[in-house]
């Protein structure tokens, strides 16, 4: 069996930043306890379980305000996906200590929304309903933000102003966003469009579109709640023409998928620990369809290898530099 190790894959800088911020919090004796994360720090249960092992507890729910109702004391960490101003205000009113791990790329989009609101624009935001990033985007300016996910959502819009700004969730498929932006342009010809697919998401999608071509299947390692993971599987099917299966870890890999395969492509979502991908690759490298002793799939639960290994004392400055870079037109 030939294994195509699609590159780049796995952790992006926004995920690493958020995890380092949370790890640093666990090491800070001055922070009020308990320490909770408002939702999943990144969409991967292996990561949230690893943080729980060092006293950083995930509290999840339908939306950020509902989750916050469950937290009464201590410190709360806002996840990489971002939160609305009302959630931040509510946390402050409850007397909670807060730490913001929002990805700089997401913050940049939220800042754009605020700028366009101040300039008198209606904002069409392309995103996945129920995902925390669009929840935060909508909550940034609820009077002017209109969340759309499909062409039917766009058809249902009734905007009287010609001042329309269009942007999107950072982890969407760039092709889906382009298609919806084209559709919006037909209905609102004067709309200003600003695609906000983050570079880490974009290069991972492009890698799958090119490198998965010709494979018998693509295995995408990532949590079922990870939107960017789902988009990688979609890209494999729609752009590379290769069927794809998403697995949370090696234990979910079905032998039926691979026993007759000659070429298997492997990639991973931006919130997937390297350890989980390595287990899949090691399994495939030793797999022999004719030898059932090679079929055993076991995940080694090693939280220490999932969590970041060191504090980064320059994290805040690097995040400021990233935000400034994006504001100046960088990608």
Curated annotation (Swiss-Prot):
Dimethylallyl diphosphate binds at residues 43, 81, 131, 226, 228, 271. It catalyses: isopentenyl diphosphate + 2 oxidized [2Fe-2S]-[ferredoxin] + H2O = (2E)-4-hydroxy-3-methylbut-2-enyl diphosphate + 2 reduced [2Fe-2S]-[ferredoxin] + 2 H(+); dimethylallyl diphosphate + 2 oxidized [2Fe-2S]-[ferredoxin] + H2O = (2E)-4-hydroxy-3-methylbut-2-enyl diphosphate + 2 reduced [2Fe-2S]-[ferredoxin] + 2 H(+). The active site is at 133 (proton donor). GO terms for biological process: dimethylallyl diphosphate biosynthetic process; isopentenyl diphosphate biosynthetic process, methylerythritol 4-phosphate pathway; terpenoid biosynthetic process. Its cofactor is [4Fe-4S] cluster. It comes from the Bacteria. GO terms for molecular function: 4 iron, 4 sulfur cluster binding; 4-hydroxy-3-methylbut-2-enyl diphosphate reductase activity; metal ion binding. Keywords: 4Fe-4S, Iron, Iron-sulfur, Isoprene biosynthesis, Metal-binding, Oxidoreductase. Its EC number is 1.17.7.4. It comes from Listeria monocytogenes serotype 4b (strain CLIP80459). [4Fe-4S] cluster binds at residues 12, 103, 198. NCBIfam families: ispH_lytB, PRK01045.1-1. PANTHER family: 4-HYDROXY-3-METHYLBUT-2-ENYL DIPHOSPHATE REDUCTASE. The gene is ispH. Gene3D superfamilies: 3.40.50.11270, 4-hydroxy-3-methylbut-2-enyl diphosphate reductase, catalytic domain. HAMAP family: IspH (MF_00191). This is 4-hydroxy-3-methylbut-2-enyl diphosphate reductase. Isopentenyl diphosphate binds at residues 43, 81, 131, 226, 228, 271. Binds 1 [4Fe-4S] cluster per subunit. (2E)-4-hydroxy-3-methylbut-2-enyl diphosphate binds at residues 43, 81, 131, 170, 226, 228, 271. Belongs to the IspH family. Catalyzes the conversion of 1-hydroxy-2-methyl-2-(E)-butenyl 4-diphosphate (HMBPP) into a mixture of isopentenyl diphosphate (IPP) and dimethylallyl diphosphate (DMAPP). Acts in the terminal step of the DOXP/MEP pathway for isoprenoid precursor biosynthesis. Pathway: Isoprenoid biosynthesis; dimethylallyl diphosphate biosynthesis; dimethylallyl diphosphate from (2E)-4-hydroxy-3-methylbutenyl diphosphate: step 1/1; Isoprenoid biosynthesis; isopentenyl diphosphate biosynthesis via DXP pathway; isopentenyl diphosphate from 1-deoxy-D-xylulose 5-phosphate: step 6/6.
